[in-house]
């Protein structure tokens, strides 16, 4: 079984919600953590709570130069990377007939382009060392959109497609890639959302799924994990 201990994990969107939970879980498993996000103060607070070495990098995933600079800082500090978790995301309820183009642009920039920026920066290092694991946070909305999340669902469908294609590209390179697709998760991003009678997941449930994917034997790749409340 693969181990997380002593690995270096880059986690985007680490200042709250799912990203924060993943960062803390990986630290509990013994990984050194790179906390990436825009809220530097909050990232520093989280870093103080970790039991393993941590580096805070204030960066916006939608700005390619920010991510390039982040990777240089990480390599200078730790010397290598092993795990990349793309958990930065934006979820805004918006019907097509709301015509809220600015919200659409934000979700496309963060959810799709942000993920691609991180991939283009980190993949060369992972491929050079012939090892590593990329975790992309998708969503059940990517294949079960509702009438109020068409664009969000489309961005997460894109993450499914990117992950599935990348898995084929990376075959026999030693680098694995997994997409995690949660149902509704109780996080600051969904605060104010009316869950109705629907049950919801906790961010910790997603963090547990990430560890499951990362700790499979070397010959096993978990391509897709779908998590729903019961």
Curated annotation (Swiss-Prot):
EC number: 1.-.-.-
Keywords: Oxidoreductase
GO molecular function annotation: oxidoreductase activity
Binding site for NADP(+): 10-34
Broadest EC class assigned to this enzyme: oxidoreductase
Protein name as catalogued: Uncharacterized oxidoreductase SERP2049
Organism: Staphylococcus epidermidis (strain ATCC 35984 / DSM 28319 / BCRC 17069 / CCUG 31568 / BM 3577 / RP62A)
Sites where the protein binds substrate: 139
């Amino acid at each position: 079984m693969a181990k997380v201990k002593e690995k270096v994990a880059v986690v985007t969107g680490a200042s709250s919600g799912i990203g924060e939970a993943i960062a803390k879980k990986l630290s509990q498993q013994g990984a050194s953590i790179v906390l990436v996000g825009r809220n530097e103060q909050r990232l520093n607070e989280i870093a103080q709570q970790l039991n393993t070495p941590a580096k805070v990098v204030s960066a916006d995933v939608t700005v390619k130069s920010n991510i390039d600079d982040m990777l240089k800082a990480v390599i200078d500090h730790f010397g290598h990377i092993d795990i990349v978790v793309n958990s930065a995301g934006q979820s805004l309820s918006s019907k097509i007939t709301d015509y809220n183009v600015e919200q659409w642009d934000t979700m496309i920039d963060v959810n799709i382009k942000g993920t691609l920026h991180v991939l283009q920066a980190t993949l060369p290092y992972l491929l050079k060392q012939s090892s590593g694991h990329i975790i992309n946070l998708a969503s059940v909305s990517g294949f079960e959109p509702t009438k109020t999340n068409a664009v969000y669902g489309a961005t997460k469908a894109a993450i499914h497609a990117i992950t599935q294609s990348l898995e084929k590209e990376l075959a026999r390179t030693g680098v694995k890639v997994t997409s995690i697709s949660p149902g509704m998760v109780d996080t600051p991003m969904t605060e104010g959302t009316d869950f109705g009678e629907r049950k919801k997941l906790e961010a910790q449930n997603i963090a547990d799924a990430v560890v499951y994917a990362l700790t499979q034997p070397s010959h096993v790749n978990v391509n897709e994990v779908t998590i729903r409340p019961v």
